[in-house]
């Protein structure tokens, strides 16, 4: 299983003029008068051809009239997307707030930003942005207080190319940097000699999701890669036949040795981890669930040169639970796991037991429990348990905010880190020898601040804090609990300006995700301040399906119970209205990826409940999701369309298949990235086309295609400002909010 951290211009493809499109297709007879009063004339949607395609699922004939949109590079698809882009641009350009919003967002984002320092050898590295740079530079210093120099500047890259990650060699002399074309998940890894500033000839291609790992000598690399896709199939190709490879610096990657693969299980994906000693290559294997909460097998390969042709040792098989590799100490490998502990615990195993350490059912003596399961769930994000300075630093979640506790390696609890408040703590990375480490703390209205922790004493000191141009004290954050449809209490954060009146007239933006065991925790977004400044409320519902309360919370809303996620979100909206925070005409909703599915399902189930909706990179065709990219790996959460019982549940809520002609839908903007290889853009294309054809009311249905971006990764600062200005302008206009 892979965990991915993401930080949320060319012309549109195709050379077809709008006139040519109209000649070929005509103009749709579906017209929508502008609900916000922006346009003088009604919207005329470009025609999307409806064909008679039918699929047979377990004896049920299911229409798919926009199947042709899955051919992303076809002239017809390109022409339709171009016409949709022109329509959306013409609508957004007429919103008075758009220009002022861009100006305000530019000011809000214009402050110096620092990333957390990390070290390799004698060098320290950290990201830095002076304010409005397109992408942050990576700086390096000799020692923590040394003079900074640029290790790498993504701002010198060609247009459309963005940085996907960095890895420094253990001696700090070589920097591996990943490049993404247009924000795609596909990443090419290059290597730079930091002394000369020149790139080495080595390039690792067709990697996704995982960073490469260096051996302690800094000359050897292990990495995960896929076979090269056929030309034009980069966004459609399923994530199959992954393998771990070995690369020696200075050699051609075409001769790299395949270290581990399972051709009999083409859907398995592998993440390499190298122990600090270099003795063991630890491989976690997942059944295709990338970036999501899945179940792992764990294997270990002895890299001791005296052990020739060492076999791969199976430590855990059977995909029984989640296993996250934490580190190595004195011959023991440490893992965070959910086996027999839905809220998580820390265990250790000696791999020299040669496979006798498989943990089944009640557990085996070869596995030693270090930190038992507690009342709060361990954060499932990568790095939630770190082995640093002969201690384990464990991040847990209490009602969807961070707690951090430090343990000795024998499991003895030492202390709880005194965090600045209610928010999200991350980082805590380092080596077993480090005495001081860094962590990041962030809240909904407080940008990330960096703290320095003395691991032995437990004292924290502020190391760096940003200086934004707004006063965070004017805002209030509070948490409430509301009942869902079945009575389950769901936590929700509310953020708003102090002194706001709860009279049902406040424009409110409700956000949700609810899937794959991913916890939605407090995080900062400069653009959100512009919403709050104008009297808007921002609400975050911590829905079931996430990981906020551990694996049981996740499992309550998967496969046949996925409807509970939508029930939780709808109940949040109803509660906000009943408590006079807002009202239907003032209530906007947003979500992305699995959260985009959430928005699609909720607007098709309850179009009467919402005043406007933003659906980002959503999974909208739940009967075809497993046919593209990493979609097959989502079956654990969604179920399989090939399974009759799963099909019934999927068919019942699939947004694309539940758009009903003659329905008055609220204003909706469907947003996707043209390089999204994770959730293929066709999901959004088909959903938007179906909504436009079905719309019986006056509200606009728009499709916005983000250029040179993927599944949330890749946009420059100016692109972020543009996208946020468009989104908030759309909401402000359609929720009749005070505009700047």
Name each region found by the language model:
Residues 527, 534, 540-740:
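Active-site-proximal cap/loop segments of hydrolase catalytic domains
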Residues 129, 338, 442, 511-516, ...:
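Glycine-rich His-Gly loop
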Residues 1-12:
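N-terminal secretory signal peptides that target proteins for export/translocation
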Residues 15-26:
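Bacterial N-terminal signal peptides
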Residues 29-409, 413-422, 426-436, 442-448, ...:
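Beta-propeller folds
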Residues 269, 278, 293-298, 321-323, ...:
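Active-site lining segments that contact anionic ligands and/or coordinate catalytic metals
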Residues 335-339, 385-390, 394-399, 482-490, ...:
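C-terminal substrate/ligand-recognition segments
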Residues 155-166, 179-184, 198, 455-459, ...:
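Cap/lid segment of the alpha/beta-hydrolase catalytic domain
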